[in-house]
């Protein structure tokens, strides 16, 4: 159990190190207005904190820096909630002032804004479409037998593909087919949609001859492609990595960049859980070797209780946890509101 004095000194060390990236000594701490005891007392308390494994001494400095255990204690017990600045609140309001009814664009905007607010790299795992439901299908005939097929989910995600049919399809025929299909299939989970859709088209086939047969094949292709896609990972602020003193060492930065570029290894790491609370993992807690020098703040987003994806910040272990957590909390609320609007449109 730490004393009040030790708690104050540990918080001061972490706060100073986050701001300066320089080891913190007793002389530096003694100049702080909230530290009112002598340098000798500070040194004794720092020695105790080091013995507890909460701070450590870098090889090249007389000062101390937080250990992973120290950061964990700080995150769990010492963070003080802060509001975002008026300028940041204005930026959030501006981003969502005009409704963005395509989730892809909305997610990209969100990733970019979160990286601007925090100056860290942002990853957003997009919705896993197989867990969603159909809102409606659209069939738009074009010239020379071409047709655009559009699939819209209840969360506003849009998939579309242009296909070539052997015969031109009239707008009247397309409208009748889509009206019937949407009446029957609205709300169907995407993982069940392909079979349900083909069953409906078979029932409808006698009314539309060859065109419906071709259309069933086209829809089958669209839904098969869509169903097999993995969720997209949206990236914001990749260049922010280069601004961190820790990552001036290319050997530390390279594996992080390679992990982000590959993306495949990130799916399990970012996949939503049933717990919608913010999750903070520090260094070795990430269980991904490339992130051993990083901290990650994750929050899962949802619409009407359905978990859809993940917002994540990646930075050094020395990241500003207060700023990261508060930025995610405020952005998450606005982001989920826009997703919910899209699901109702």
UniProtKB/Swiss-Prot annotation:
Keywords: Repressor, Stress response, Transcription, Transcription regulation. InterPro entries: GAF-like_dom_sf, HrcA, HrcA_C, WH-like_DNA-bd_sf, WH_DNA-bd_sf, WHTH_transcript_rep_HrcA_IDD. One of its GO terms (molecular function) is DNA binding. One of its GO terms (biological process) is negative regulation of DNA-templated transcription. It comes from the Bacteria. It holds the Pfam family HrcA. Negative regulator of class I heat shock genes (grpE-dnaK-dnaJ and groELS operons). Prevents heat-shock induction of these operons. Belongs to the HrcA family. This is Heat-inducible transcription repressor HrcA. It comes from Exiguobacterium sibiricum (strain DSM 17290 / CCUG 55495 / CIP 109462 / JCM 13490 / 255-15).
